[in-house]
Every structure is written in C-alpha cells, then in structure tokens.
C-alpha cells in the first residue's frame, strides 16, 4: 500500500536578499550566500507557476499560494528583481531600512514609489539595519516607529509588517512591534507561515538552494525546511553568546544612533 507523503501545514513565505547576474563588488563576503543569480530567480518563478501557485500578499496570507519577500532594500530590487517579477506577473513584499534609502547600493524613494505603482508592497526592516535584541526600550521603539511612519508618509498606505534585521528577535521585540502598530513580525524561522499569527515564518533562499530543494519548499515537504531549521536551531545559543562577546565575528551591527 502506498504511503502518504507528509505535507506541512501553512503557506511558504520565501526570503530573498539580492538578485543579480553577480553580486556587487561592495557586498561583504559573508553575504554572498544570500545573492541569487538572475537566472536562478527566473527559474524560481517558473517553478512557482508550474507547481500551480500564485504569489500573494502577507496581509492576505490565507489566500496566498506563496509569498515572496526581499530584505534590506538593495538597489538590485529595482534594477533586477522588479523587471523579472513584472515579466512573470508576480508580486513581492520588500522590507527596507528607512535610514539607508537613497544611500549607495540601496533603493531611492522614487524607485520605491515606482515599484509600488507596479504592484509591489513595502514593509519595515527597522530604521537602521541593527540588531533589535537588547536595545533599550526607547531605542527599540524608535527603530520600529520611525521606519513605519516614514514609509507610511511616503507611500500613503499602512505598513503592517516588520522583519527583524538578521532574523534576531525575542518576545520583547514582538511585543514592542505590536505596540508600535504592526500586525505581525516576520522571522527567519524555516517553516511555513500560519495565517493569523503574530509572527510570520520565512524560509531563506540562498545562492546554493537547489531546484529540488526549492520545489520541496513550494510543495511544503519537510525536506525543503528541515536542513535550514536544524542549522538555525543548533546555532541559536552560540549566536546569542557571540552577540554579547564578539558581535563583529557575526558581521552584524549592534550600535544605533537616536534621531
């Protein structure tokens, strides 16, 4: 008798960082694994169509087949990802740090406005790209509210989701985000997202993500999620210890300036 394949409950929410023919020379070597080639990204969109899924929105997660998200507000979002998405008729959510808008290698406000007119959505990645864990309450609130308000003022629409930089968050960060007016906080926890939850799981897509693994992610098979989930779980405690003693080794920014 044939065995029934295990399918995970929820909605696949994919997390990208950069799409380009090759990563810019200014990208830190530790970030290269997050840069997906344009060819690979096109194939991903083809796979999504062949599986029979449609890209949707975080604010309508229950009816989405898959959600595409991009972190960091890189210039490649406009230069490379947008044309590919538009050609495929696909939607995506872009999480930007408002302090870096207009900086070299990042999106400008005019590009963000153009992308929104093209059907893309923008959410918060904090004001600065800093670790939110351990920030004093006032600084944490500043990071969350400043980004939300700037985006809302510029785009004329509500910003309901925030993604913690580096995927580092705890209950205090989630509570502060909800208090600041967000509906939910997006994580880097490799598992399908559950509609209606206060946290939204996302699975990272890497340069080394194979077509087979990508297909498993779309079909919500454990093989698409468990390897990254295990890596995250095993590194949870060591990563937090390193944050306290030698954060530079992780390539993260922990200091923040107030407005």
Whereabouts are the PLM-identified features?
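Short histidine/acidic/glycine/proline-rich micro-motifs that form metal-
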Residues: 98-102, 131, 165-168
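Histidine-centered catalytic micro-motifs
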Residues: 14, 121-129
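Charged helix-capping and loop-helix junction motifs
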Residues: 105-112, 138-144
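Short beta-strand and adjacent tight-turn residues that come in two discontinuous sequence segments
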Residues: 95, 125, 185-187
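C-terminal active-site subregion of NodB/CE4 polysaccharide deacetylases
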Residues: 1-69, 74-76, 134-161, 167-259
